[in-house]
């Protein structure tokens, strides 16, 4: 009997999901993306060679693994084709292994224009989107007016819908945002060119997943972004436009929760965030700069510098509850090497002095101060360790304390960027 394993982020994204998905796909017949778009950036390092994936599931670098893009993913055809071409230039066979749901919404040029125009108009109050058109594409989906991958293969129907959409969106772009209109014919011609390339890769992904399940195959579900960026459970409004938590798996793939066997929460050994929004443990001192430098904390999609701070057990407890986490994978432990002391946030103190748990929206974070528990650091290197016994005693104590504070077991520890720099204590597919 096969197992269905989920890999998702428990913080604000950038937790190191790509490496872990790549590591675990050794046991998987298929990997499926179920939400987000090319705003994701999953970095894989294999034998020292770095590859960044945005839309294509991280299993593509494992020979023979089927890669599926589910209905919950918003697909930018131009970005997808660029990614396919780059991988093919490296000798990776993509088209015979990649399949895309016809129900996946399309991101087109007017979505990108709207996204960027809105951020520009917000000025200092900007949310910090990637400007890739993700939000506007999900808006069209929910408003039941969006174009989907399957529409690409019906030219007349596509053209009629596109004309209506451009009338609607160009009115906003020109009259409200004072930006140029998007050209209908150019957009149509581009989309029809992409249609010819995408048609062989279209497949009913939901049906395929259930066929694999019934055949007893192991399947991996690859999340994008992090739990605290979830449209419903994140630090709203500083969130993404999809459900990054476990609930998004079923809606974005068509595989019900009863069939999910193990949910692995990828968790960085410290905390980072890109863009605007609350971040209680953020560091503005030399330690924060050290974490950013050692951890190479720059967004793989946008190149923006990530904000860095101490580990926050409060937000992790919330993520564990919301996602029904089975086990934690602790990443970037080696970045903490050499720090004399390490702080863990165990609660938030409000203006009345009461210690509380994580709020549900961004405004409620105003005025909260982190309550820290100080732990000794370690001088020894953890880089490349492959067994728990190789880690310094202080590092093992740090890991144990995180388990105690969160109530979840740490099943995997990442000690470096390469797939073999990993300690596996309990395998999700076992």
Curated annotation (Swiss-Prot):
SUPFAM superfamilies: P-loop containing nucleoside triphosphate hydrolases (SSF52540). Substrate binds at residues 300-306. It comes from the Bacteria. The keyword GTP-binding applies. It catalyses: IMP + L-aspartate + GTP = N(6)-(1,2-dicarboxyethyl)-AMP + GDP + phosphate + 2 H(+). SMART domains: Adenylsucc_synt. It is an enzyme of class 6 (ligase). Its EC number is 6.3.4.4. GO terms for biological process: 'de novo' AMP biosynthetic process; IMP metabolic process. One of its GO terms (cellular component) is cytoplasm. InterPro entries: Adenylosuccin_syn_GTP-bd, Adenylosuccin_syn_Lys_AS, Adenylosuccinate_synth_dom1, Adenylosuccinate_synth_dom2, Adenylosuccinate_synth_dom3, Adenylosuccinate_synthetase, P-loop_NTPase. The active site is at 14 (proton acceptor), 42 (proton donor). IMP binds at residues 14-17, 39-42, 130, 144, 225, 240, 304. PANTHER family: ADENYLOSUCCINATE SYNTHETASE (PTHR11846:SF0). This is Adenylosuccinate synthetase. It comes from Pseudomonas putida (strain W619). The gene is purA.
